[in-house]
């Protein structure tokens, strides 16, 4: 048996996999997040490739421009430089108290990363010699609530709604999509970083990283939770204020500005609490006769025009069919595009990234249609996209019963997702229920 562990990972699957494994093994351990890659020339970052690819397919740019983007989007090692699933889960590791304070999402090329890795090893040895320092001792329901409030502040990936409940399950704690929805409703959204914001992810660290976010929202956090430092969250934050951490981050931001000829300030990246980008979090869980068990939307990355919309259903049974229709202009303004049979039991729940980017990068479609799926999305996805529609089609969920021309109502503020009409004609909820029952029998 091992006495302790150090878990190193960076990306979409590795980081949540490590956190689930760490919770299951339940020995004293410290997580070392692998950091973020640098942005390329013109602040190019990887999630923009979907946009470039869609523009190329539509004939809006030539192959030379596409090749330029492909060759420059990943100039270093590290997680993709936007708040996608990899970045979100690195941040969650620190927010849960399982990584050293200030260690999440630093540039992977920074010499500080090696220093944090060495310190993590030393701390893991200390934890192994102490009592009551296993993950199950440190991570409580309050720790998860802290992490979810940080998730709201950063406009984190919707895939977090899959990973965080799985980690909590290993620790005997129940966290659901409703937990996210409840905490997000009145939470501040502060981080102006891609894909929902303006700047590449390395800027997050230069603005003070997770500790800076926590300082802004600390009145809503449980500051007495324990962490892998052997101290409480509140003690960690106080220590960082005193040891020059934020001054060091400011120095890195100055170098970034020098590199790109910009004059970005900390407040441009992480907004002050009273000047938040949004005051209702960043995700919403929608329910209705189309998703009785819920569906999720990142509303901070969705055009305001689509917060309430009535659209015509255009169902597809695979992403390939749908993407082809979007790129060939067979999808029109006012359509609700469905991709179904892409849930966990269907095709293993792959990401619908290229279809979502083809829609959001289209000036006309990006603000006039929606994409609804029982699959999931890349953390890079933007636009009017709704995923995790449950029950999934393979399980006989209502998404499997949608037909061409059904009227679909999306209401983000009211958290509703409903079929409200058939063949373009509005019907009562009772009539809709009867028609869906008949379709199910057929």
Regions flagged by a language model, labelled:
Residues 1-18, 30-33:
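A short, small-residue-rich loop immediately preceding and capping a beta-strand
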Residues 15, 21-27, 34-368, 372-392, ...:
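Catalytic or ion-coupling anion/metal-binding cores of large enzyme and transporter domains
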């Amino acid at each position: 048996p091992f006495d302790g562990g150090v878990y190193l990972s960076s990306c979409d699957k590795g980081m949540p996999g490590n956190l689930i494994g760490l919770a299951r093994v339940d020995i004293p351990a410290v997580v070392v997040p692998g950091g973020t890659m640098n942005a390329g020339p013109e602040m190019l970052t990887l999630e923009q490739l979907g946009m470039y690819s869609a523009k190329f397919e539509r004939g809006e740019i030539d192959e030379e421009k596409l090749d330029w983007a492909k060759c420059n989007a990943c100039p270093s090692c590290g997680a993709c430089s936007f708040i996608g699933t990899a970045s979100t889960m690195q941040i969650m590791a620190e927010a849960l108290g399982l990584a050293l304070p200030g260690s999440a999402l630093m540039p992977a090329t920074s010499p500080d990363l090696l220093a944090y890795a060495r310190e993590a090893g030393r701390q893991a040895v200390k934890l192994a010699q102490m009592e009551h320092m296993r993950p199950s001792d440190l991570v409580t329901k309050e720790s998860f609530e802290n992490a979810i409030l940080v998730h709201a502040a950063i406009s984190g990936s919707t895939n977090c709604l899959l990973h965080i409940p799985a980690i909590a399950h290993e620790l005997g704690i129940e966290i659901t999509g409703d937990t996210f929805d409840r905490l997000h409703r009145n939470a501040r959204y502060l981080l102006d970083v891609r894909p929902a914001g303006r700047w590449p992810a390395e800027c997050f660290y230069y603005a003070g990283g997770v500790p800076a976010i926590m300082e802004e929202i600390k009145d809503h956090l449980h500051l007495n939770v324990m962490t892998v430092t052997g101290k409480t969250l509140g003690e960690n934050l106080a220590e960082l204020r005193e040891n020059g951490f934020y001054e060091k981050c400011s120095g890195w931001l100055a170098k970034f500005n020098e590199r790109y000829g910009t004059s970005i300030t900390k407040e441009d990246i992480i907004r002050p609490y009273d000047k938040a980008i949004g005051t209702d979090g960043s995700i919403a869980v929608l329910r209705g006769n189309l998703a009785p068990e819920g569906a999720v939307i990142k509303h901070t990355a969705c055009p305001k025009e689509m917060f309430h919309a009535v659209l015509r259903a255009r169902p597809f049974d695979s992403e390939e069919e749908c993407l082809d229709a979007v790129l060939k202009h067979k999808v029109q303004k006012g359509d609700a595009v469905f991709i179904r049979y892409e849930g966990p039991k269907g095709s293993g729940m792959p990401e619908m990234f290229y279809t979502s980017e083809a829609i959001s990068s289209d000036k006309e479609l990006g603000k006039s249609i929606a994409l609804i799926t029982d699959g999931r999305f890349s953390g890079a996805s933007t636009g009017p996209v709704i995923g995790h529609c449950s029950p999934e089609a393979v399980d006989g969920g209502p998404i499997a019963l949608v037909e061409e021309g059904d009227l679909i109502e999306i209401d983000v503020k009211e958290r509703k997702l409903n079929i409200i009409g058939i063949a373009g004609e509005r019907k009562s909820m009772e009539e809709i229920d009867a028609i869906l029952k008949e379709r199910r029998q057929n």
